[in-house]
């Protein structure tokens, strides 16, 4: 990747998967289909990253402070927060470096820029892969806690959770390094897309099965009550809404980015696909939004964690 390209890319080597796609660089007024290009100001991009950064730092600090939260479930939640933290740090860092280079406030050689670009790319990709893995791990942990409740503490031990998280981090770093090294190979892009779809299917199946089991449990409890139908209907709607939020946020925030990768592999030269490529920075912003939403869904719903978070905030003041 040329030095100038590395200074301007929104995601370094990942964005340079499109180097072979001339249409990506088309201006909005050039020939081709009418494209909807959503501009994400650098200021907004940085603000989203900083909000996510602070939010996930608080989650990590709260879990580290409270020994009652040193359990397998919170181990996965903490690692998810760390992954989202790295997503935010890497994107904010790259955007800040890019702005400084464009403003001429940072004078470094092309070789240094290239090396920095590669390091940030590996950091971004590994944090994305690990974030997806820990979302799947949280779903599996909840599934085991429901369907194997009596054996849960013997199946999901803290040591096993720690080994699993170490394996996820190692696999994420290795896979992201290979991805950056072979970003121009179609099979690499397709592997990432298949991985995303596998995580989506895994989460959908596990959470749907948990919802079905919960509805059956409520049905058994309310069988003798007069307002059985209303209770079942209310619980079913609440469960369906929760499932929709979980999978909807996941698909909305991650789906466009992996659609982007799919189109690079399938139709890199097609004018319609080039319209999607123009919104690459928007897709990154959505991933950062996911890093903001994750603590709200998985961490802050815990009363114990919220209590510890208040203590952390009061202590910091």
From Swiss-Prot:
One of its GO terms (biological process) is adenylate cyclase-activating G protein-coupled receptor signaling pathway. The chain crosses the membrane at residues 38-63, 73-93, 119-140, 164-183, 192-211, 241-266, 280-300. One of its GO terms (molecular function) is melanocyte-stimulating hormone receptor activity. Glycans are attached at residues 15, 29. Its main location: membrane. Pfam families: 7tm_1. GO terms for cellular component: plasma membrane. This is Melanocyte-stimulating hormone receptor. It comes from Galago senegalensis. The gene is MC1R.
């Amino acid at each position: 990747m040329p030095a100038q390209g590395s200074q301007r890319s929104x995601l370094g080597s990942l964005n340079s998967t499109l180097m072979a796609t001339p249409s990506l660089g088309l201006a909005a007024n050039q020939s081709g289909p009418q494209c909807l290009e959503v501009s994400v100001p650098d200021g907004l991009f940085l603000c989203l990253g900083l909000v996510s950064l602070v939010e996930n730092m608080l989650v990590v600090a709260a879990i580290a402070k409270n020994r009652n939260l040193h359990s397998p479930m919170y181990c996965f939640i903490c690692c998810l927060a760390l992954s989202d933290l790295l997503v935010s740090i890497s994107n904010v860092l790259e955007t800040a470096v890019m702005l400084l280079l464009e403003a001429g406030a940072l004078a470094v050689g092309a070789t240094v820029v290239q090396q920095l670009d590669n390091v940030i790319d590996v950091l971004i990709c590994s944090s994305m892969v690990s974030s997806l893995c820990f979302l799947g791990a949280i779903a599996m942990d909840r599934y085991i806690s429901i369907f194997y409740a009596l054996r849960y503490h013997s199946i999901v031990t803290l040591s096993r959770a720690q080994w699993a998280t170490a394996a996820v981090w190692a696999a994420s770093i290795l896979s992201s390094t290979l991805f950056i090294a072979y970003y121009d190979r179609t099979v690499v892009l397709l592997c990432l897309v298949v991985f995303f779809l596998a995580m989506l299917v895994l989460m959908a199946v596990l959470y749907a099965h948990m919802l079905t089991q919960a509805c059956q449990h409520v049905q058994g409890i309310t069988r003798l009550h007069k307002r059985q139908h209303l209770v079942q209907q209310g619980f079913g709607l609440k469960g369906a809404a929760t499932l929709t939020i979980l999978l909807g946020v996941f698909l909305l925030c991650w789906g466009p980015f992996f659609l982007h990768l799919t189109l690079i592999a399938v139709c890199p030269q097609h004018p319609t696909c080039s319209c999607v490529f123009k919104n690459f920075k928007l897709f990154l912003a959505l991933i950062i939004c996911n890093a903001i939403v994750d603590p709200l869904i998985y961490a802050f719903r815990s009363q114990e964690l919220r209590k510890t978070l208040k203590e952390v905030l009061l202590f910091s003041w």
